[in-house]
Design a protein with these regions (language model features):
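N-terminal secretory signal peptides that target proteins for export/translocation
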Residues: 1-12
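Domain-level signature for soluble enzymes in the chorismate/prephenate branch of the shikimate pathway
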Residues: 14-319
Length: 319
């Protein structure tokens, strides 16, 4: 990349940053915000006795999110990857999929971003927010000083980094497909030098002993999960999500249109589009506490680069 291209990219990033700041101020004034207006599952059109695919195995936070959202009105299918869960819905093998979306400490779950971008016939119909309490666990009889290797999902490793530096600075880490997969691995290994960081319930499920609780950086740790369907939602909720595929210097025009439509930009995640440098796929989430209207959606989807992924309400579980 030459100096001219680098300057253009820096300028574009500056424009986006300034635009987001302006939007934040605007939404505080206009009344669109993250408090209130949250729909419950009762307000959504959920299929009875649904088949729900989720990022497994049993004992993951994704399973907890799925059970919280659907209750007893569903059968649950654990899958090894986010992509497998999404493909179940696309192929008609499941009515819904539940996947992790974003964590307050670890940021966006990259697999979720890539999975949504890759599918044209998948929609977001709900969101679940869970409090996350990461727990260190090992086989019975394990002491902290025994541990040489800590296994977890990438998010669990990132969220516990500060605690591990203080209490087991010499222990290595190994990423697993999920926190529950890490707990299962430790149970099968039967090795006191290996521990897992997972949800508290995974310890009981896999016969492990809890060595330390709340090893995440902060008690404010939360993860958001998407509920996906192959059916486009008929009703609009308080939130909506879009995919924008464009060059970096065009995304600010879309952000301004979101502002003009009276919507709050909640999050924006980007991934390289893959065809040439400077082109990206963006996941854009918007919100308005009074509910999003069809007119607002049409205003945003007027761009040829925009693909609508759904409008939905949010359920949050509290400790």
């Amino acid at each position: 990349m030459n100096n001219k291209d680098q300057n253009r990219e820096r300028k574009t990033k500056t424009i986006i940053s300034i635009t987001v700041i302006i939007l934040a101020v605007y939404t505080l004034i206009s009344g669109c915000g993250t408090n209130g207006g949250k729909q419950t599952q009762d307000a959504l059109q959920i299929i009875d006795n649904a088949l729900v695919s989720y990022l497994g195995p049993e004992g993951t936070y994704t399973e907890e999110a799925a059970q919280f959202f659907f209750g007893d009105n569903a059968a649950f299918i654990p899958r090894s990857t986010v992509q497998e869960a999404i493909e179940d819905v696309v192929a008609g093998n499941a009515d819904y999929a539940v996947i992790p979306q974003e964590n307050t400490l670890g940021g966006a779950v990259v697999n979720y971003v890539d999975g949504l971008i890759a599918q044209d016939d998948i929609f977001v119909v709900g969101e679940v927010i869970l409090p996350i309490s990461q727990t260190l666990m090992g086989i019975p009889g394990t002491a902290l000083e025994d541990i040489k290797l800590v296994c977890s999902h990438a998010q669990g490793i990132k969220q516990s980094e500060q605690w591990r530096k203080e209490h087991m600075p010499d222990a290595d880490t190994q990423e697993m497909g999920s926190t529950a997969a890490a707990a299962s691995y430790v149970a099968e290994a039967k090795d006191k030098t290996i521990a897992a960081i997972a949800a508290p319930g995974a310890a009981k499920l896999y016969g492990l002993s809890v060595l330390a609780e709340n090893v995440q950086i902060t008690d404010a740790n939360k993860t958001r999960f998407y509920v996906l369907s192959s059916a486009k939602p008929d009703e609009t909720g308080t939130n909506a999500v879009f995919v924008a595929s464009c060059e970096a210097n065009k995304i600010d025009d879309i952000i301004v249109e979101i502002h003009n439509a009276g919507l709050e930009l909640v999050t924006i995640h980007d991934r390289p589009e893959g065809s040439f440098l400077g082109s990206y796929n963006y996941i854009l989430e918007v919100e308005c506490k009074n509910g999003i209207t069809d007119k607002q959606l049409k205003s945003v989807t007027g761009f040829s680069e925009i693909r609508y992924l759904g409008s939905y309400g949010v359920m949050e579980k509290h400790n």
